[in-house]
Amino acid sequence: MVATIEQRTMRKIYWRILPFTGLLYFICYLDRVNVGFAALTMRQDLGLSQAALGLGMGTAFFIGYFLLEVPSNVILHKIGARLWIARIMITWGLISGATAFVSGEWSFYTVRFLLGLAEAGFFPGMILFFTYWFPPVHRGRIIAGFMTAIPISIALGAPVSTSIMELNGFLGLAGWKWLFLIEATPALLLGISCLLFLTDRPEKASWLAADEKAWLAAELKKEQREVEAERTYSVWQAMYNPRVIALAVIYFGIAAASVGLVMFLAQIVKELGLSNFWTGYASSIPYVVGTIGMIVAGFVTDRMGQRRWNCFALCLLAAAGLALAGLTHGTWWSIAALSIATIGFYGMKPSFWPMPSLFLTGTAAAAGIAWINALGNLAGTITPWVVGTIKDATGSFGGGLYALAGFAVLSAIVTVIGVPSTRRRAPRLTAVAEAAAE
């Protein structure tokens, strides 16, 4: 059967964009969280308290991240993803590598703050970039595929990072220094690759035929007309639009729950009586399950077209998994419960992130998406402290898991009361989805 123009076009775009951008995000997330593995020996070498370590890992990083999130995305919209994503990756690679040379508490705070500034705008920039290339019916799947980089980076990051740290003493450098130097290198190389490989807009794509460009331009223009027929927004109107604020609260709740879990997952799993080696592998199980759940959820949300109710159901699933983990912590049942929670965390994202583009376009979309991500990620400065405080007070992670479940319930409630219906008549799924998944 001769492929339709939609099938031909979208197959080319999926294979051109998804593997490369997924690799970028894998490296991005690994460079963000590898400090947790480095801390196994770095904390003692630098004389950092646990409080100082947490302040640098979370608070300093996310303050920097918050400050430049919106400006970064607006700049990307103006000058294009090719140059701006390359800039982001090269600067974060340099700063991540510079972490190898911190010498104490304040230099650690400074480099983490600078890393947050450098990385700001990468994720919302990618979400915005996808709106330039993918019609609405395809966005759930592309976001699902892209965001599988998070659970994969967590699942693989522990053994890779701890293996690098075995270089301790080589050329007179501590293992944690080698960790930062080696894992920063791919960001630098991929940043340069962005200049060669990324294409800002479909009209500049030499790898698309003229009829394919025309079809895609018509599809995206149709979406823009539908959105603008409802209303157009300035940057400031977008940032303070009630729907944008509601989406930010939803993302804050689910980010609070997921960040709180990932920070303490190893300690929760350690309660099963495992060695450090097997704790790492057991900790990866929920994220393998979450990866599968995200991919399936991406197909389901594009087929159904109802982003809001899919998001609501998966937020509740995350809450249920966390509550069950609180009930069963210290037993192997908690691994199953946490796997349910990760399906909810990651499965909701393919339904959630296409929603801003249902009512925002252009610069307003750039600002709105970045604002949602910036406000949501402020959760990273709060939840680890909440879980740790409850653990100190009660001696158990159960109460902390219940608190995280409460944040996920908040997201579910706001999804229902704060987000209007997102149902749009979506074209029938074509074979391109299956082709992209093969």
Task: Pin down the residues of each PLM region.
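Extracellular/periplasmic helix-loop-helix junction of adjacent transmembrane segments
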Residues: G36-L67
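Central cavity-lining transmembrane alpha-helices of secondary-active solute carriers
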Residues: G58-V74, S284-A297
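Extracytoplasmic gate region of multi-pass secondary transporters
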Residues: V35-G36, W236-I295, K349, W353, ...
